[in-house]
A protein has these predicted regions:
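Peripheral, non-transmembrane regulatory/ligand-interaction domains of membrane transport proteins
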Residues: 1-210
């Protein structure tokens, strides 16, 4: 699936039609969001930007030290978004490409941060707050950091509850230990996820392509 946010008469409009991308000018497009992209969608975007998009397997295999790269015209960045489950968290690789002020995001599942931002941008409908793809990328990171902070707050409350249960002399049985172990794993995942984003943001801010 493809969603294109583009400038039209000083407002921001959207299109979910691949053919529209071929009709739009390079200066019109702000954000191309690809969710489980088809081969045709990827090829059309690659031709439009004159660059190569990473596959999901490539994005997932990239080591943390190599999650950022750039060419003369394009920035490539990869990070993981945490998806909370009933007990444990999972991660979803997201690729970001910025070329000449156009942001491309590539993912395989719906993500609340991106969906909410698209709704907000279209509701405001003005280009004043989001004149380029760089501004949209910053907004995505801000929204994601807020969600990560919410997860940390929830885990802090869970840790506090476990501490109270121990203080009250509750029997530390196998289920209790399993819950503690899962909480530790979740905490480590959130920490690694936050550090991963810090590295990505730091690299982008250091780039001479960032306005």
């Amino acid at each position: 699936m493809i969603k294109i946010l583009y400038k039209s008469n000083r407002q921001i409009a959207e299109s979910c039609t691949l053919a529209d991308l071929e009709e739009l000018g390079f200066d019109d497009v702000l954000w191309i969001d690809l969710v489980e992209p088809t081969g045709d969608e990827k090829r059309t975007v690659e031709e439009f930007l004159d660059t190569t998009l990473q596959s999901r397997a490539t994005a997932e295999e990239i080591e943390s030290s190599s999650r950022y790269s750039e060419t003369e015209t394009t920035i490539f960045a990869n990070t993981n978004f945490l998806i909370p489950g009933p007990d444990s968290y999972s991660t979803e690789a997201v690729s970001f490409i910025i070329s000449e002020g156009i942001l491309v995001t590539i993912r395989q599942v719906p993500l609340r941060t991106l969906t909410d931002l698209q709704r907000r941008i279209l509701a405001l409908s003005t280009t004043k707050l989001y004149p380029t793809g760089y501004h949209i990328l910053v907004a995505i990171m801000e929204g994601r950091i807020d969600l990560d902070a919410d997860m940390i707050e929830i885990m802090s409350k869970e840790i506090e509850q476990f501490s109270k249960r121990v203080s009250l002399g509750e029997n530390v049985n196998e289920d209790f230990l399993l819950d503690i172990n899962q909480l530790q794993e979740n905490t480590m995942m959130v920490r690694e996820n936050v550090v991963d984003k810090q590295r990505m943001i730091s690299s982008i801010l250091k780039s001479d392509k960032f306005p």
